[in-house]
Amino acid sequence: MGSNPTLAASLRHQGYPMSSTCTHIDAVGQLAPPREVCETCIAIGGEWVNLRQCLTCAVTLCCDSSPNQHMSGHNRATAHPLMRSAMPDQDWSWCFVDQAMLRETPGGWETFDPFLEAGTSMVGEYLAAGGSPDPAPDFVNEHGFPLGDWFAFVREARANGELEPRDAARLEAIPGWRW
């Protein structure tokens, strides 16, 4: 998955957890590839922004940025808990119930936090270039990523016991990192 800091920051600021356990993975069915249209928008003459595919029944519907928000409506109507992006070059999934980002790995499904991962991938370069491990809260790096906000977010998550041990270990392995 390519990191999407805008999506990640949006989810984080909406109060979604850093990562959590999803207990709905067994709801993933055998899926055909997603369609290139919102099946409901086509039927009613609507328009869509991005597409999502239900991981239970494989229907392809529009996202919450679209006027009709058919995928969220599908979740409310059917209680199908999981969906994935049906957009090219996006391979993330979402559990509506657990409010968790998911991805399929060779070892199975895992939850993850895209904001945490995007920052983790950038902080090593930043620190190696002489960046401060205590940047200003409003510091944004040359890629437009809010690293100051990210440092505060990670430290707060650790202080609150919300940082996964695997994520803490990744950070602690970065030269120059400190809590």
Task: Go through the PLM ranges and name each one.
Residues 38-41, 54:
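Short cysteine-rich clusters marking metal-coordination/redox-active sites
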